[in-house]
Amino acid sequence: MPSTRETILAALHARFSALPAAALRGEVLPERVPAAGLLLLRDGEPGEPEVTLSPLRYHYQHRAEVEAVVQGASRDATFDTLCASIGTALAADRTLGGLCDWLEAEAPVPVDLPIEGAAPLKAAVITIVLHYTSSDPLA
């Protein structure tokens, strides 16, 4: 049986997979970026939990990361559309069907990355804060 953390991250990846951009989890940046953009989900860090003792529960504010990447002449507009679609997907159900207590995204800080012999990339790391509770740090 998957852990609470893995179940939530898999649901988040599934949510991103429904978007027009290609969504990968734990992969390296491919050589080609699709026209609609690319989302790379990184598991991130669960951080130190707050602990309650009766019953024993671990309350996490897990910081997963999504690398949003676009390429091409209209990368500014494509990047904006990609970020807006991420926000819409997250706002549609902030508990991922009850798997977590709440999730929210932090604002991206985009950067333009020049690529020799190709169109530049526009990319940003978007932190997604996942609030959830588990009965065990490994469960």
Regions found by a protein language model. Name each.
Residues 1-33, 44-139:
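Charged, amphipathic alpha-helical segments and their flanking helix caps
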Residues 41:
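Paired acidic/hydrophobic, glycine-rich loop segments that form the ligand-binding mouth/hinge
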